[in-house]
């Protein structure tokens, strides 16, 4: 039986965490830099614990004004401090609630930059490995960040997106474009099933891109996140695909 993880970005102050945590199997917990608060983190951790959901850190650039979605070019020392600060804080809060942090998934611009920039990808992977080599690194399927994680000796989780469209090179369509996001349930479900069952996704130019779907992301800040999660989980199970971390 095929198996796939379902994840969402949480603790970003968007209000849908409790509902999503009854449907997903991995929670990407924001670390109060690009969005959210300590209270949001603690609440998300409590809901995750109640539902047996795997916990990962979701660190981003310290850029609340742009929700961490604007590219930054930090020095290695500044990036190390930025990530260690966020990972350390979440790890401490997890331990305080008797939980374990299992993986790291960078947020927004950091995630997308590292997908295409090998120097940044290597730096991010090295920082995570130095922080805790037992952590896994979640990154875009086929990306340089995924390769860097493997090279750094980390376990990796290859991620695909239910609610984002793809470029022919396998990267995500930039949010600045009007066709960046998938808004209909039907299109999201079809895209998910194609990625999980067939190992490919249709790009915006109609070409097919090979993907490895270890985990499917739904954005927790999206207006359709809960509906997507309900329907996608239902359709995966109906197709004989187990939803599990």
UniProtKB/Swiss-Prot annotation:
Documented EC number(s): 3.5.2.9
Annotated TM spans: none
GO molecular function: 5-oxoprolinase (ATP-hydrolyzing) activity; ATP binding
Keyword Heme attributed: no
GO biological process: carbohydrate metabolic process
Keywords attached to this entry: ATP-binding, Hydrolase, Nucleotide-binding
CDD domains: LamB_YcsF_YbgL_like
Group of enzyme by EC: hydrolase
Catalyzed reactions: 5-oxo-L-proline + ATP + 2 H2O = L-glutamate + ADP + phosphate + H(+)
InterPro entries: Glyco_hydro/deAcase_b/a-brl, LamB/YcsF/PxpA-like
Family: Belongs to the LamB/PxpA family.
HAMAP family noted in UniProt: PxpA (MF_00691)
Stated role: Catalyzes the cleavage of 5-oxoproline to form L-glutamate coupled to the hydrolysis of ATP to ADP and inorganic phosphate.
Quaternary structure and interacting proteins, as annotated: Forms a complex composed of PxpA, PxpB and PxpC.
Protein's UniProt name: 5-oxoprolinase subunit A
The gene coding this protein: pxpA
